[in-house]
Amino acid sequence: MSRAYDLVVIGAGSGGLEAGWNAASLHKKRVAVIDLQKHHGPPHYAALGGTCVNVGCVPKKLMVTGANYMDTIRESAGFGWELDRESVRPNWKALIAAKNKAVSGINDSYEGMFADTEGLTFHQGFGALQDNHTVLVRESADPNSAVLETLDTEYILLATGSWPQHLGIEGDDLCITSNEAFYLDEAPKRALCVGGGYISIEFAGIFNAYKARGGQVDLAYRGDMILRGFDSELRKQLTEQLRANGINVRTHENPAKVTKNADGTRHVVFESGAEADYDVVMLAIGRVPRSQTLQLDKAGVEVAKNGAIKVDAYSKTNVDNIYAIGDVTDRVMLTPVAINEGAAFVDTVFANKPRATDHTKVACAVFSIPPMGVCGYVEEDAAKKYDQVAVYESSFTPLMHNISGSTYKKFMVRIVTNHADGEVLGVHMLGDSSPEIIQSVAICLKMGAKISDFYNTIGVHPTSAEELCSMRTPAYFYQKGKRVEKIDSNL
């Protein structure tokens, strides 16, 4: 039988839009895309472009860029700029207004895409399954809410993303998440960022730059070191630099209770027994797949305990015509990954060219101050897979910071290789421009570059990136999973 649509996509994020546009434009398919609203902001925050465009990568990068001017202004004196720093004031409202305008422009461009693409239509509401070929567009997340539309389709693509987690403690409702942080009326003078991941660290940097004078930013993390899963030496160095910038990093610390003071501020009691007052408590303790309102049981779609939709290498669920991509599958929660998965889905289903996204050697960045850029294995994981692993490392003060007054800003580079053949397994960097540098490095890793390819390449001088071309001697090794100073050829 002929169905009304070839494809219904639930979720207008980066992955969903990539799949929808490719299917309609490249393969002339009839595609419906469902999401909660067209433009960013409350009440739903999700809108055209998904988390990345509306309450994620894009606005965050703009705000971090603004925050970096704090150091630029301070450091300019070392380069001969005479500024009256007492007269320099951050304007949070101006930042948010500019950010909102930029994001609205992207929302508008996506609206234009729907208007200009034959066969591609947008449907506003909550998407939910009725069966494996029928999608309901509901008025709200309530499964009993009014049905606005019923869409009959051959294929279904689930691309609903992820959502910030809450702590589940008393006073949880008095805290905000990154969603609300993008729309605060004013920068908090006293802020607590809860969590040791990249979102918490990035917002700590933003709040630290825009806070009123005399303010304080605390970052509380229950573990012993921030950024679990990243290179351990970079984590240590970043912590030192965050503290040098004035951020109070509190490890082995977690809120136990939050109450509201008479003046509207928040009183936090920590698990350690310590207490403090804040204007804003922002939770950034992780994100969970957003699948709860999809009524997946109606079509028999399998999910993991955390709500992640189970898929195979080609993003297909256990139901033959239903696929899922992006954060909702809890594979690699990065926008470019979701985009690649969306394109691969269309290649597989509509182009008859089955393609699985390669989730290895994916570069990523932490837009902390200073930023981090990484790609590939950390040394501990490499040592579990390879018999002999070599670790190269370098830490230095970039040229500019010899006169900027920020000599504490070290640039750190660490390279992990398979010592048996020299293949570069991972590159990890901390310092200015790391996110830009790591993109080129990722191409090298994808091509199977060896450490000799790095040091036989002539560097660009004077840059921090040229250090990648100067690292010839390993600092230490791993052999049979154990760290050693040199390789024992008898083992």
UniProtKB/Swiss-Prot annotation:
pH dependence: Optimum pH is 7.5-8.0.
Cellular component GO terms held in the UniProt record: cytosol; mitochondrion
Pfam families: Pyr_redox_2, Pyr_redox_dim
Family: Belongs to the class-I pyridine nucleotide-disulfide oxidoreductase family.
GO biological process: cell redox homeostasis; cellular response to oxidative stress; glutathione metabolic process
Subunit structure: Homodimer.
Disulfide bonding pattern of the chain: C52-C57
Lineage: Eukaryota, Discoba, Euglenozoa, Kinetoplastea, Metakinetoplastina
Note: The active site is a redox-active disulfide bond.
Name of the protein in question: Trypanothione reductase
Record keyword Membrane present: no
Keyword annotations: Cytoplasm, Disulfide bond, FAD, Flavoprotein, NADP, Oxidoreductase, Redox-active center
Intracellular or extracellular location(s): Cytoplasm
Reactions listed under catalytic activity: trypanothione + NADP(+) = trypanothione disulfide + NADPH + H(+)
Broadest EC class assigned to this enzyme: oxidoreductase
Documented EC number(s): 1.8.1.12
Catalytic residues of the enzyme: H461
Record has Protein transport as a keyword: no
